[in-house]
Regions:
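Sec-dependent bacterial lipoprotein signal peptides
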Residues: 1-17
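N-terminal helix-cap/turn-to-beta initiation motif at the start of protein domains
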Residues: 17-31
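Exposed, flexible binding/inhibitory loops of compact, secreted disulfide-stabilized domains
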Residues: 27, 33, 44-52, 71
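Contiguous, well-ordered beta-strand patches that form the walls/edges
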Residues: 36-44, 56-120
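Short, low-complexity, Pro/Ser/Thr/Gly-rich segments in the mature regions of secreted, periplasmic
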Residues: 126-135
Length: 136
């Protein structure tokens, strides 16, 4: 009986150590599908991914020369803030604004309004573009 009780306590202890998602339906890996600019131009995206977990966002362009960048992520109310992007593997090197453009980001500190977020799709809008994502 004592062994069963210890086993149950051990299992409860292990399961309580998991980090719960703090960003709701935004947490996870997302593929950027389109960037709709305010001037009417629509850009179809090819192999651009956002990975969101806790207070970090990783953006990466696979198969191109966009590289991978890691930044700070904050989600409050219906607003997302992404900032302080650095090159993955060389954290001393800040990401330039030109390097952020293929990801639909145009500022060092990006504020986006979450228009809609389900478990499968999300739409975010900034002052320059509307980003459409699908869960990956």
């Amino acid at each position: 009986m004592k062994q069963i009780l210890l086993f149950i306590l051990f299992m409860l202890g292990i399961s309580s150590c998991d980090k719960a998602p703090i960003n709701g339906k935004l947490d996870g890996r997302w593929q950027l599908m389109t960037i709709e600019y305010t001037n009417g131009k629509i850009e179809e995206c090819n192999r651009i991914y956002y990975s969101i977990q806790l207070h970090l966002v990783e953006i990466s362009a696979k198969g191109g020369n966009g590289g991978t960048h890691i930044g700070r992520f904050s989600y409050k109310g219906d607003e997302v803030t992404m900032s302080e992007f650095r090159h993955r593997g060389d954290e001393e090197k800040l990401t330039t604004l030109n390097e952020l453009k293929p990801f639909g980001l145009n500022q060092a500190i990006n504020h986006l309004k979450v228009e809609k977020a389900t478990g499968k799709k999300q739409f975010q809008k900034s002052d320059c573009a509307r980003l459409t994502f699908r869960k990956f």
